[in-house]
């Protein structure tokens, strides 16, 4: 058996079977931020005008792959509910594009879709009953359960947490009951906001779930041994390990949050719009589910665009990097010039 056949079966290069057979693959995309028109945009940043074309490329790229389902982690569209005319137009653009997906799509509400998490200093309006009604009218349930073989995927509305709305208690009771019902199965959680991105006791900020809801959610991860958590919102890739749960923060398909460019020692070029158009940081995840684990593959899109009406280029070959989980002989290493683990403070507004 050759190396490529080993990888397809979830084997490492020695022929062992730490993961077992591959069961299926899902795609996780996030922060697509579709605008109300092909080039119309209510953002002051030029790169945001490309969101629709970049999403169209992602849809066609997904259609080339063998995937079982697609989960969008929120901020489907860019106009917020406070501007209902633009919101509705962006919804129409989103639905037109995803109607071409071959795999079924499931959506998580983001702060642009249903209102920001409860706080007094958010740049947009917070979640409320009217915004919830708008979401359910256009996209369906705020939270849901998806069963695939012995895996259970829970999609939640993170903006409800700490809101005090009646739906918060309903979601809380639903999630606790559903997790109890899923005992013995492999559990995955999908949320727009991450519980945290630096450490579990970090201060409240724009990009995490506030207390006391954060501790409640983390407690559920621990209690039910959730295999993996996937979140968006920060438009940058992060990986954390919370007890036994792998926590992934996904990149955006549309643009990068320029405030996080301050983490790096080299300033963005003018073409990168202060880091907002840093092309190698754009993409999505393929989550390969095996019998005894999962492997996340980051697909970089490099901001590729597909204008409306153009035919997709299906001649470009699909290539994948072999993941270390699939290669027990991965022994290559090198000394870092700069510490990747250092903690860097960034300005809160970019």
Question: Which sequence ranges carry the predicted segments?
Answer:
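Residue-level marker for buried hydrophobic side chains located in beta-strands
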Residues: 26-28, 70-72, 107, 189, ...
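N-terminal active-site segment of His-dependent metallophosphoesterases
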Residues: 1-84
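Short acidic, glycine-rich surface-loop motifs adjacent to enzyme active sites
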Residues: 77, 182-199
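Histidine-centered catalytic micro-motifs
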Residues: 34, 189-195, 229-237
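Binuclear metal-dependent phosphoesterase catalytic core
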Residues: 237-349
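Active-site-proximal beta-strand elements of phosphoester/diester hydrolases
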Residues: 23-40, 150-160, 188-190, 245-252, ...
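Active-site glycine-centered loops adjacent to acidic/histidine catalytic or metal-binding residues
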Residues: 31, 74-75, 110-111, 192, ...
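Extended active-site neighborhood of metal-dependent phosphoesterases/phosphodiesterases
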Residues: 3-18, 45, 81-186, 207, ...
């Amino acid at each position: 058996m050759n190396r490529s056949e080993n990888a397809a079966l979830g084997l490492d290069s020695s022929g062992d079977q730490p993961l077992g057979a591959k069961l299926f693959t899902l795609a996780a995309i996030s922060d697509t931020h579709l605008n109300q028109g092909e080039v119309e945009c209510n953002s002051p940043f030029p790169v945001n005008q490309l969101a629709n074309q970049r999403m169209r490329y992602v849809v066609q790229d997904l259609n080339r792959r063998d995937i079982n389902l697609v989960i969008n982690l929120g901020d489907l569209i860019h106009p917020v509910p406070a501007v209902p005319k633009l919101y509705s137009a962006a919804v129409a653009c989103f639905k037109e594009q995803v109607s071409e997906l071959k795999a079924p799509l499931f959506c998580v509400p983001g702060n642009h879709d249903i209102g920001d998490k409860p706080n007094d200093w958010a740049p947009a309006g917070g979640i409320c009953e009217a915004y919830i009604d708008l979401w359910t009218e256009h996209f369906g349930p705020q939270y849901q359960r998806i069963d695939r073989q012995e895996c259970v995927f829970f999609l939640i509305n993170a903006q409800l947490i700490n809101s005090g709305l009646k739906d918060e208690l309903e979601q809380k009771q639903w999630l606790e009951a559903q997790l109890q019902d899923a005992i013995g199965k492999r559990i995955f959680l999908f949320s727009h906001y991450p519980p945290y991105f630096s450490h579990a006791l970090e201060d409240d900020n724009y990009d995490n779930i506030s207390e006391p809801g954060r501790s409640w959610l983390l407690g559920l991860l621990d209690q039910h041994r959730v295999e993996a958590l996937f979140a968006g919102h920060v438009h940058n890739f992060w990986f954390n390990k919370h007890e036994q749960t792998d926590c992934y923060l996904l990149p955006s398909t549309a643009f990068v949050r320029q405030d996080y460019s301050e983490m790096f020692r080299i300033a963005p070029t003018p073409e990168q719009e202060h880091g907002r158009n840093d092309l190698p940081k754009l993409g999505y995840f393929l989550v390969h589910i095996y019998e005894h684990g999962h492997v996340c593959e980051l697909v970089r899109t490099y901001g590729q665009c597909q204008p409306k009406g153009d035919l997709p280029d299906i001649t470009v070959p699909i290539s994948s990097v072999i993941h270390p989980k699939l290669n027990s002989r991965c022994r290559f290493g090198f000394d870092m010039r700069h510490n990747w683990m250092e903690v860097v403070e960034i300005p809160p507004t970019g």
